Amino acid sequence: MRSYRTTRRAVGLLAAAALGTGLLSACASDDDDGSKSDSGDGGSGKTTITMGLFGTFGFEEAGLYDEYEKLNPDITIKQDVIERNENYYPALLNHLTSNSGLADVQAIEVANIAEVVDTQADRFMDLGKVDGASEDAFLDWKWQQATADDGKTIGLGTDVGPMAVCYRKDHFEAAGLPTDREEVAELWAGDWEKFLDAGRDFKENGPEGVAWVDSADAVYDGAIASSEGKYYDEAGEVIYKDSPDVEAAWGIASTAAEEKLTGNLEQFTKQWDQAMSNGDFATISCPAWMLGYIQEKGGTKAEGKWDVAQSPRPGNWGGSFLGVPESGPNKDEAAKLVAWLTAPEQQAKLFAERGNFPSAPPAYDMEAVRTATNPYFGDAPIGELFSASAEEIPVQTIGPKDQVIDDNIGNGLQLIEQGKQDPDGAWDEAVKAVDNALDQ
């Protein structure tokens, strides 16, 4: 599978499972088509603000729409949800190009934000100038991702995906590895090579039939997410072939595949879901939203067996934005709504109810975030853990075709896991596929 919310790497943002008592994963389930989907006002005379979304952002489920309507009695909010970003995003581009059929508010996934900023910025309002929206309230790199060279900010961040590693305590114990989350984090602190070393120990001493990690692709995702560089330079040139960060992440992931430390699974497939349910792997790269997915697939039989530790290095995987098209009939009111929905207070409420990790650092000191724990994961202090990770995430240059490059690198890693190519041959195949996709 290529995409649910954006691709297999972003699909977890759709997972709709409880994160402890009331906490759910970021952007929840792709089964929800939105109960507030019509855009009429029924003759009430109220201003109806339409929200064009993909997946489930959780605003309605967390009660934020109802709260805003009570604060603003002349406003009605209706959302129109397309389940998968692979269907939503092409339609959004078509509407932007024709300048018709747009909702008052349109969501943009992080994998697409660079392309929208580069090619469609003139179609959106500058939300940096809207009352209630402050650059200082957001992570700097998150704000910059949606800001054009001329300083126009076309979207406000809804969430981010700070990284951790989720691990099975029962499997670690059986392999003679520590199970305390702080001691576990020390196994690989600061270095993904140490993560492989722990995996080698696990392979030698762990339970038969249990892989160290689910997939080489997930190892790569974690490693590249924690790197300074990625696929483009600041001038917008594609540099992945010569990037030392990509080379290092590929080296870590391809080694994991070649040494058979992985479960040879493709994330967000039925086979992967079943393996998670059965406990067939011991670790997984774990952004905040992944916790809910693990809980959903692990069910009651895995409760208390999983825990969460800091990743080898801080990184980010996931996150979205809300933008306001210039052609919208209610753009001023829509901009006010977007500023309110993405304010730290609302982001903290959304985390408490749905698990979407805030892109606004002021929310990290709020009790709903700061004291959050997850009973399913042994009362892991997820608010504290993910806040610390979020504040240390490296700033990466996001390019317009990051997802295309990412997908084809993942396909190359699968060739190694399947025994079809060695790492050098798999890299060559990945490069050919990327170059074809980019017409190079």
Segments from the language model and where they lie:
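Conserved N-terminal structural module of periplasmic/extracytoplasmic solute-binding proteins
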Residues: 2-114, 132, 179, 329-333, ...
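Short helix-initiation/N-cap motifs at beta->coil->alpha
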Residues: 81-92, 110-111, 188-194, 264-278
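Hinge/lid segment of periplasmic solute-binding proteins
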Residues: 109-164, 303-307, 373
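Periplasmic solute-binding protein
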Residues: 114-119, 143-183, 215-235, 317-324, ...
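Short, solvent-exposed loop/beta-turn-alpha elements that line the ligand-binding surface or hinge
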Residues: 128-138, 182-189, 229-248, 296-301, ...
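Glycine-centered hinge/linker elements that transmit conformational signals in sensory
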Residues: 196-199, 235-266
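Extracytoplasmic/periplasmic substrate-recognition and gating elements
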Residues: 258-259, 297-358
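C-terminal capping/gating helix-and-loop segments adjacent to ligand/active sites or protein-protein/ligand interfaces
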Residues: 266, 378-430
